[in-house]
Structures are given as structure tokens and as C-alpha cells.
């Protein structure tokens, strides 16, 4: 199977996908209610898309193509409200967060769709363990070579995106010590990690042809890379974020990535180098384990600082670009996260107060649904 042509798209356009938790209101455990929710929302007019995910306790919302923060957050709120209203009718709550804190993977049910059944057969129990919840951000690119350039230049900042969105400290009733435990599950898949260091689209087409020739992959969907080109949309897709606890934070992180992309395209003159990946796995681990307090090593200068400090410096670099993109409000929310903490900090504070993970999930659902 050949690689799809890289579709035209408006540079720096944005789109967001969010995977959401469905919770029974009696115990705030995951509830296999996606089929019923989807039947109800199908009767409603709404923007974007509302889709099933791997297991029946999940649902995905996708925005349409947007240009700036105001339109993006407005559409995310509308999608949130449609799903939340359908859930309320069914006594099901909806929540953000990267993991459910006390569900057990063995209890999950695969959603009845051919691709999900295929993945379940292929990956076995990993498919049910993939009941985790992430945010994907699409950035429009002017062409395929530019998409590969942006893929590699943004890879340096993967720890920023992980640390800002981190909201998955609890797994199966325990605090893992990680800010984002969700990404440990993603790393279990054989085609996860970073994209190969290829800078020209014709070379990427050759790589893809070799991979399909082995029978290992059939399409770009089979690559679970942290950032991957999405040729059918004309975008790159950043895939490392936990689903944040509110749509406002989700939109703000997306616009942080958008403003950074504009900075890279317009102002930054560095070319990507393969040695940029020397500390990639270390920096990624630091973000997953310690969040904003993690150590960040600059791959070129070898300077060490906290991820929080690196984000603060980046906010200065991209301030003019954020202003051009009408994303000043989004950047203010990013600064607020640096001060008050990410979703993991909120969840741990809630657990310290409530001493019960079901109560934490009730509060988390109320926060997501805007109650």
C-alpha cells in the first residue's frame, strides 16, 4: 500500500482530538456506555465529530479545523456539553484525565468495530490496557517537507507537552509516582517512540514502502510515534499529551504548540540534526516521571534546567507569535499551570483532601463538565 499524497492545508491551522472517560455515577468506575452515548449524540446537531475508541468505556471528540484559540475552545465546549448531556440522561459522568485511577484492564470490553477487534487480536491484553486517555493536536503544514522539518524541530519540546498536560498519576488504585503514567502503556507498543530521522518526503515515502513491504504496517495509523505526519490531513499530529482536566487547558496546550510551530517556521533558523535525539528518551522520561520539576537537557548546549524553566523561556520566545495568532489568553493559562501545577498536582491534592479515589473522580468529572 502506497503512502497517501500530502494534502494541502492552511499552515498553522489546528485541530484537537480528546479521548474521554465514561463513568458510572453510582461508583465512578469506568462504565461501558459508549454505544448508548453515541446513539444519543447521533440525534443531536453538533460541530466536529464524536467517535468510539478502543474500549466501550471511552469516547473521542474531534474538533473541525480551527485557526485560533477562541474558535477552538468554543467548539470544544460545545462537544463537551453534547457528550455530557447524553451522559447525564444515562446516569453516566464524563471526565478528562490520562488514566482512570482504579479501573482494572481485565474488566474492559472492546468496542464492536472491525479495526478494534483486529487490534485486540494483534496486541492481546495490551488492547484492553490501552484504556487510557490522550489529547492529540494537529498543526497544518504548507507541504510535506515542512511537515517533516516541524516534526523533528518540535521533538525537542516533547517534554513541555507531556509535563503541561500530565494528569495520570494513579493506576489500579495506587499512586505510581509518575506525573504521566499513561505514556508507559503507549511505550508497550512496538511502533511507538520517535519518528525516523528523515527530512525529505520522497525519502519518507521510501521508508514507508520498506515498512509496508515487510508486512509490519499497512497505513500511517500503525505508527504510534510521539509526533507523526498525517498526510491525508496535511498536518503533523502531536500525540504525547494526557487528556487535560478541562477543555480550556486542552485548547491552551494546543495553541502553545501552534505558537511554537509558528516560531519554528517563521523565526527559528536551526535545522534539525540526528544528534537532537541523543537525550530524547531521557528528557521524555523526566517529563513523565517528574512533570514540570523534571530535568531537561538541551541536546545542543548540554545545559540542564527544569522543564518548568525551559517552558518559561519558550513563552518569551513565542510571545509575539502567540499575539499574532490571538492566543494571548491561552499563554496566560500556560503560565498559570507553571505556577499552580498541572492536572497531576490537582489530582494529588484532591486525593489528599478526599482520601478516596472515587470521590476524586467525582470531582474530576464535575470539573470537566463545568459543574
UniProtKB/Swiss-Prot annotation:
Its EC number is 6.3.2.2. The keyword Nucleotide-binding applies. Keywords: ATP-binding, Ligase, Nucleotide-binding. InterPro entries: GCL_type2/YbdK_subfam (IPR050141), GCS2 (IPR006336), Gln_synth/guanido_kin_cat_dom (IPR014746), YbdK (IPR011793). Disulfide bonds: none annotated. Transmembrane segments: none annotated. GO terms for biological process: modified amino acid biosynthetic process. It catalyses: L-cysteine + L-glutamate + ATP = gamma-L-glutamyl-L-cysteine + ADP + phosphate + H(+). Pfam families: GCS2 (PF04107). The keyword Cell inner membrane does not apply. GO terms for molecular function: ATP binding; glutamate-cysteine ligase activity. ATP-dependent carboxylate-amine ligase which exhibits weak glutamate--cysteine ligase activity. HAMAP family: Glu_cys_ligase_2 (MF_01609). Belongs to the glutamate--cysteine ligase type 2 family. YbdK subfamily. This is Putative glutamate--cysteine ligase 2. It comes from Nitrosospira multiformis (strain ATCC 25196 / NCIMB 11849 / C 71). The lineage of its organism: Bacteria, Pseudomonadati, Pseudomonadota, Betaproteobacteria, Nitrosomonadales.
Amino acid at each position: 500500500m502506497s503512502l497517501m499524497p500530502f494534502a494541502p492545508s492552511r499552515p498553522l491551522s489546528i485541530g484537537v482530538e480528546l479521548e474521554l472517560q465514561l463513568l458510572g455515577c453510582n461508583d465512578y468506575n469506568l462504565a461501558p456506555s459508549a454505544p448508548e452515548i453515541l446513539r444519543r449524540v447521533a440525534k443531536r446537531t453538533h460541530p466536529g465529530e464524536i467517535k468510539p475508541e478502543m474500549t466501550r468505556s471511552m469516547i473521542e471528540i474531534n474538533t473541525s479545523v480551527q485557526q485560533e484559540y477562541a474558535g477552538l475552545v468554543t467548539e470544544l465546549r460545545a462537544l463537551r456539553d453534547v457528550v455530557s448531556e447524553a451522559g447525564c440522561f444515562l446516569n453516566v459522568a464524563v471526565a478528562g484525565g490520562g488514566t482512570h485511577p482504579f479501573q482494572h484492564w481485565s474488566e474492559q470490553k472492546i468496542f464492536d468495530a472491525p479495526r478494534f477487534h483486529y487490534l485486540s487480536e494483534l496486541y492481546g491484553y495490551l488492547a484492553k490496557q490501552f484504556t487510557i486517555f490522550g489529547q492529540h493536536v494537529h498543526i497544518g503544514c504548507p507541504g510535506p517537507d515542512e511537515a517533516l522539518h516541524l516534526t523533528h524541530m518540535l521533538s525537542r519540546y516533547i517534554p513541555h507537552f507531556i509535563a503541561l498536560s500530565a494528569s495520570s498519576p494513579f493506576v489500579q488504585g495506587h499512586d505510581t509516582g509518575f506525573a504521566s503514567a499513561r505514556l508507559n502503556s503507549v511505550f508497550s507498543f512496538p511502533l511507538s517512540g520517535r519518528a525516523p530521522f528523515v527530512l525529505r518526503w520522497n525519502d519518507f515515502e521510501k521508508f514507508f514502502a520498506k515498512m509496508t513491504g515487510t508486512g509490519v504496517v499497512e497505513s500511517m495509523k500503525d505508527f504510534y510515534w510521539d509526533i507523526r505526519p498525517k498526510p491525508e490531513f496535511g498536518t503533523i499530529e502531536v500525540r504525547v499529551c494526557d487528556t487535560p482536566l478541562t477543555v480550556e487547558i486542552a485548547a491552551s496546550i494546543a495553541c502553545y504548540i501552534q505558537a511554537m510551530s509558528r516560531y519554528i517556521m517563521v523565526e527559528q533558523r536551526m535545522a534539525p540534526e540526528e544528534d537532537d535525539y541523543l537525550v530524547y528518551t531521557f528528557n521524555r522520561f523526566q517529563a513523565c516521571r517528574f512533570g514540570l520539576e523534571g530535568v531537561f537537557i538541551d541536546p545542543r548546549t548540554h545545559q540542564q534546567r527544569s522543564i518548568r524553566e525551559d517552558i518559561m523561556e519558550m513563552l518569551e520566545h513565542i510571545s509575539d507569535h502567540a499575539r499574532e495568532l490571538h492566543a494571548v489568553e491561552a499563554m496566560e493559562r500556560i503560565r498559570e499551570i507553571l505556577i499552580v501545577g498541572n492536572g497531576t498536582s490537582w489530582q494529588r491534592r484532591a486525593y489528599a483532601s478526599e482520601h478516596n479515589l472515587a470521590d476524586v473522580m467525582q470531582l474530576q468529572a464535575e470539573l470537566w463538565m463545568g459543574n
